[in-house]
Amino acid sequence: PSMGQDNINRGIHSTLWGFAAIAVMMIIYYVTFGAVSVLALGINLLLLVAILSMLQATLTLPGLAAIALALGMAIDANVLINERIREELRNGNTPQASIHAGYDRAFDTILDSNVTTLIAGLALFMFGTGPIKGFAVVHVLGILTSMFSAVLVSRAIVNLIYGYRRKLTKLSIGQIYKA
């Protein structure tokens, strides 16, 4: 039992260190939009843990692996959005138009990747047993919270920061390289 608890503690620490590393990298690379992504990622993690707590789920190593995967998919969605906004800025669009187009145009890609992963998670749940089924439950919930946090939460935060500014001339999204 103590060996299993030790592995779970290490898994929790690994997930937290991974979160911290992602946070630092995102803020350095995307500045304000990186901070928004990190805040949305934190909300994603809190939502996922809250849902698991409401379900009275026991935290296991497969569950921790699914949480780590959910965090990876959530940050990937934010990277897609941020890069799409940068691309729109490079194309000469205004900051407001770039934000709008960035979220809209990244959505299909994010939805496709999450739906295909969700299908795999549902298959694992239907046909798996024991730890595989536990992984699948956390994985499916993580996909749903990731979609919510990456698309809706981050956009709401960006709208809070930039939405009221009508004469916005610049975005704090890191270096925008023109080819």
Model-derived features: positions:
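Alpha-helical transmembrane segments of multi-pass inner-membrane proteins
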Residues: 9, 13, 17, 35, ...
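Hydrophobic transmembrane alpha-helices
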Residues: 26, 41-45, 64-78, 122-125, ...
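Structural signature of multi-pass, alpha-helical inner-membrane proteins
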Residues: 1-15, 167-179
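Hydrophobic alpha-helical transmembrane segments of membrane transport and translocation systems
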Residues: 87-179
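Interfacial segments of transmembrane alpha-helices in multi-pass membrane proteins
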Residues: 5-60, 126-130
